[in-house]
Amino acid sequence: ARSREPVKVKKALPEQCSLLEDLGYLVCDASQEDLIVTVPTEISKVFHQLEREGYTERKTRYDLLDGYAMATVHLYGAISQPDLVDIFNRQNSQPTSEEELFPALLRHVAVGAPYCFWEEYIVCGEFEENGFEDVRDLMRQCGGKPRYIPEKDDLLRYADWNYYERTPQMDALTAFLMNEGHQPRRDAEEIAGEIQYACVIEADMEQIYDILGDYDMELDGSAVEAFVKVMMSVKNNTRLWAN
């Protein structure tokens, strides 16, 4: 919207523009070698008005707050709003407050963020499935244990819901899935990520085998024994929500 001229986009990525085009925010011309994208004048005017009113700064700020919510829920499963404010303020020069945090995150919850609010907590949205009973269990297990709080850049890596800590044990699991499970690297890493998450929430082995089943992956007798050995190593070296 800042550009006064049409912008060229590689045709290999047209899906990035399709929703905005359907909404009327973009006009796309695919008749040439590159996809030519233009913002209608009316939309451009609205954008520049929002920009003058500080919209881009607010969005950057709210996206950072969302990143902290995503990262801490991914890392801990649940976190109280005061605790999230405390972590944010320790790592940023411009402090936040619960009064700013709640409405900012509510905007992200409204459009499908993987976390939600429960009492004073921000929690993984999956807890809603059983009426948040598992949150209560998690809080009891955590008690007053000190939290592992990475430095800002390391913490915000967890804002990517597919991110997991690369450890020798996870590398061994990925290699096993490729070599014994005959999975391509991309699928092996995806399966490993799902298994790592299952370990974080302390899922049992039956649930982990269900993950393999979702990918139509079967193991024979000797491979099953080797898989259990690899899995025990992963489980013993995974940071749990309850820790």
Where are each of the predicted segments found?
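Short amphipathic alpha-helical interface segments
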Residues: 1-13, 65-89
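Short amphipathic alpha-helical interaction segments
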Residues: 7-28, 94-104
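Accessory beta->alpha helical hairpin/"wing" motif in late/C-terminal subdomains of nucleic-acid enzymes
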Residues: 27-55, 115-137
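Short alpha-helical segments that sit at the start of domains
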Residues: 47-67, 163-169, 182-184
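Protein-protein interaction regions
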Residues: 60-62, 94-103, 114-118
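Contiguous interface-forming segments/domains that mediate binding rather than catalysis
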Residues: 67, 82, 86-89, 96-111
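Long, charge-rich, low-complexity intrinsically disordered regions
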Residues: 102, 111-231
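Cys/His-clustered metal-coordination modules, chiefly Zn-binding fingers
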Residues: 242-243
